[in-house]
A protein has these predicted regions:
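Carbohydrate-interacting regions of secretory-pathway proteins
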Residues: 21-235
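Bacterial Sec-dependent N-terminal signal peptides
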Residues: 1-28
C-alpha cells in the first residue's frame, strides 16, 4: 500500500509539473493581465528563429536590457514563446543617447524570414533629438514604424528616463499610447492601410502586417535599451 501510495504521489507530482509548464507556454485567459517578464530571468522568451542561450540580453536591477553592440555582434531580436491575436500590451522603457529599439507584434518565425520586421508591425522607440541620422516623422518614437506617425499629443521623456507605452490590437483596430496619451490610431488591413503598405517601405515585404496572430518581439538594434513591467492582456 505504501509503495503504491508513493508511486501515485510521484506520478501526480510529475503531472502537476507538466501542467504548470504547459500553462506557462499557452495563451493566458482573456481579460487577465499576465507578466511577460518576471524581472529576474528570460523565461518565456527566445531568440528570433533561434534556440539555446539568448545572447546580448541581460537583467539589470529588475529590467530586461539589450546590451548594445556593433552591428555584426548583435544578439538579435527576442520573441515571446507564446503567440497572441487580440491583446493589450503595456511596458516601461528607456534608451541611452542616440538609442534605437522597438516592440513588434504578430511576428512570424520561419526559414523565409530573417527578421521580425518582415512580418510584425513595430512601435518605434528612438532618440528623436540626438539620433545621428535625420529622422522622418514615420521613424520617430511612438510611430507605427513606416506606416502611421504619432500625433501632437506625443510627450516623450528625456533620454535616460522611463516612459510608459501601450499597444492595443483588437480585431484590426490598433492604438499606440505613450505616457498616458493615445498618439496613434488606425485600422489594419483596410484600403488605406493596404495602399500605404504597397507604396511605402513595406512594398517589398509581402507578408508584412498580414498575420492575425503572432509573437511579441523586442528589437536589438545595436543600442542599449531597457524594458520592465512588460504585461499583456488577451482581448
Amino acid at each position: 500500500m505504501k509503495r503504491n501510495f508513493l508511486k501515485t504521489t510521484a506520478t501526480l507530482l510529475v503531472v502537476i509539473a507538466c501542467v504548470s509548464f504547459v500553462n506557462n507556454e499557452t495563451v493566458p485567459q482573456k481579460g487577465k493581465w499576465v507578466k511577460l517578464f518576471d524581472g529576474k530571468s528570460l523565461k518565456g522568451w527566445h531568440g528570433f528563429n533561434k534556440t539555446g542561450i539568448i545572447k546580448n540580453w541581460d537583467i539589470e536591477d529588475g529590467a530586461l536590457v539589450c546590451l548594445g553592440a556593433a552591428k555584426d555582434a548583435h544578439g538579435g531580436d527576442i520573441v515571446t514563446n507564446v503567440a497572441y491575436d487580440n491583446f493589450e500590451l503595456k511596458w516601461e522603457w528607456k534608451i541611452d543617447k542616440q538609442g534605437n529599439s522597438g516592440v513588434m507584434y504578430h511576428v512570424v518565425e520561419g526559414k523565409k524570414y530573417k527578421s521580425p520586421y518582415e512580418t510584425g508591425p513595430e512601435y518605434q522607440m528612438i532618440d528623436d533629438i540626438d539620433f545621428p541620422e535625420k529622422l522622418e516623422d514615420w521613424q520617430k518614437t511612438g510611430a507605427d514604424y513606416a506606416m502611421n506617425i504619432a500625433n501632437d499629443k506625443k510627450k516623450v521623456n528625456p533620454v535616460g528616463e522611463w516612459n510608459t507605452s501601450k499597444i492595443i490590437f483588437n480585431k484590426g483596430h490598433v492604438e499606440h499610447w505613450l505616457n498616458g496619451e493615445k498618439i496613434v490610431s488606425f485600422k489594419a488591413w483596410d484600403a488605406k492601410w493596404m495602399k500605404e503598405k504597397q507604396e511605402g517601405k513595406w512594398k517589398d515585404y509581402p507578408d508584412y502586417g498580414l498575420a492575425k496572430k503572432g509573437l511579441i518581439a523586442l528589437q536589438d538594434h545595436g543600442n542599449k535599451a531597457y524594458y520592465k513591467n512588460i504585461m499583456i492582456k488577451v482581448l
